[in-house]
């Protein structure tokens, strides 16, 4: 049952399509930066060659393409 409570979950880990035009999968959504960073690092390992980003709302914090 919904309690009507709102959560602030600003950190997102997303996998993008090969043309970087849209999100294919929301991998993680959390309010904790350390959890988001760990999810990002694991997603990059499990999805070699794919575009994975870590964002805080609209701010880009990490991109798998910059790790090469």
Language model: regions and residue ranges:
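Short aromatic-glycine-(Arg/Gly/Cys) micro-motifs in beta-strand/loop hairpins
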Residues: 1-24
């Amino acid at each position: 049952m919904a309690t009507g409570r709102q959560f602030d979950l600003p950190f997102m880990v997303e996998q993008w399509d090969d043309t970087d035009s849209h999100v294919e999968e929301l991998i993680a959504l959390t309010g904790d930066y350390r959890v988001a960073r760990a999810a990002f690092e694991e997603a990059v390992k499990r999805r070699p060659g794919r575009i994975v980003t870590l964002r805080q709302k609209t701010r880009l914090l990490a991109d798998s393409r910059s790790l090469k």
